Structures are given as C-alpha cells and as structure tokens.
Amino acid sequence: RIGSVGMLWACNGGGWLGHFISDSDIRNSKIKRLLEKGEIEEFYVESVKNPFYIRSEDTEYLNKKSTKKEVKFLAPLDNLLWDRKMIRDIFDFDYSWEVYTPVAKRKFGYYVLPVLYGNQFIGRFEPKQYRGEEELRLENWWWEDGIKINDRLIEKLEEGMNRFCNYLGAQQVNKDDWNNMVLNR
C-alpha cells in the first residue's frame, strides 16, 4: 500500500482503507514489522508532526530534485489523493471529489481535476468533452491562492493540456474557454 501511494503516514485515512489495515493496531504492528525487516523507512516532512513511511527501495527519491517541472492533471481517484488529510497537511491543498455531492452543496464542481506543477498544486479545473465534439471544454478553472502566473507556467500548462487532450482523443481545448478561464484570471 505504501508503494502504491509513494509514501504514507500511519494516521487513519483513505490511504489505508481495505487490506485489513484500517484498524490502527493492526496497521501499526505491520509498520513496526516492516521497519524491523528493513522493507520500509521512516522520515519526516517539514511542518508535519507525524512520521511518514516509504519503501526502502524508493528512498533515493527523497533527496532527488527534479529539474523537469511538468503540469499533471490528476484523476479524482489517483493514488496520491487517497488520503485527503495527508495531501492537505503536506501541500496545503484541500480536495474533495464532489461527484456525489448535491449541486447546491458543491464548492467547485461535478468532476474537478487537481492541477499539479512540479511538486505544487496550482489549481483545479472541470473539463467536459461532449459526444461528437472534437474540442475539450473547460466548464470552470480555479487557481490556488498565491500562484504567480508567468509565461513559463502558461507554456507548461499548454503542454499539459495538449497531452490531456491527446489522451482523451480531443483535438484541442476550446480556445475561448482557455483564454477566458485560464489566461484571464
């Protein structure tokens, strides 16, 4: 489970659901055993009090700095997002999948995707591809507070959106949506 997310803490949360490890006593004894066997390692994230665990074979990633910053659009059920509290504590990003939330109670939208740039959540958006149309529509776009928009970020967003459109089989994102929602904050 730790490997599928990349890292986890021992706190209750979505990352531990299933596998009979949502019970904290069982989970903590398994973590202790994995630590003793050297299969996982403990580390701390600045400003988070609880320790995190990573597979020993993955520890090289802890000190690895990526020079390649890309924009990624995460699916609502992406492994990284399983533990919403962990994401909030590490990235200061509060995310909720509102697909089952009544329309009147939604903060954002029906199917909203987080936008990750390097190691920072910079926004979220609600895409929509209508049957028979070649363009991807943007129903909404929300920037996270404090994001500095510059030419490099826009270039990376365009690259990410092109990859996303290609993945979906769309020819392109609707230019009016892009200009009105993304470029004109």
What are the residue ranges of the model-derived segments?
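Long, charged, low-complexity, helical-prone intrinsically disordered regions
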Residues: 1-185
